Amino acid sequence: AVPAGTLSPLQMESLREVCEVNVACDEMADTAGIVAAYTXFYGPVP
């Protein structure tokens, strides 16, 4: 997985767009952060 500090704002926005359509992922992002939520539901950040 890619450490959160190495993602550009555009990459972070892309993760949010994927995650927000999944209610469970979106809720996890609110508490654990978008990178943690994305990796838990979709695997390593591309």
Curated annotation (Swiss-Prot):
Name any GO cellular component annotation: extracellular region
Keyword Transmembrane on this protein?
no
**Chain positions with 4-carboxyglutamate modification:** E13, E17, E20, E27
Question: Which sites bind Ca(2+) 2?
Answer: E17, E20
Would the keyword Secreted be found if you checked this record's keyword annotation?
yes
Source taxon at top rank = Eukaryota
List residues binding Ca(2+) 3: E20, D26
The UniProt entry, under InterPro entries, shows: GLA-like_dom_SF, GLA_domain, Osteocalcin, Osteocalcin/MGP
Q: Which PROSITE patterns match?
A: GLA_1 (PS00011), GLA_2 (PS50998)
Instruction: Output the GO biological process annotations, alphabetical, semicolon-separated.
Output: biomineral tissue development; bone development; cellular response to insulin stimulus; glucose homeostasis; negative regulation of bone development; osteoblast differentiation; regulation of bone mineralization; regulation of cellular response to insulin stimulus
Binding-site positions, Ca(2+) 1: E13
Q: Where in the cell is it found?
A: Secreted
Q: Which cysteines are joined by disulfide bonds?
A: C19-C25
Any idea what job this protein has? The carboxylated form is one of the main organic components of the bone matrix, which constitutes 1-2% of the total bone protein. The carboxylated form binds strongly to apatite and calcium.
Family label: Belongs to the osteocalcin/matrix Gla protein family.
Q: What is this protein called?
A: Osteocalcin 2
Q: Which gene encodes it?
A: bglap2
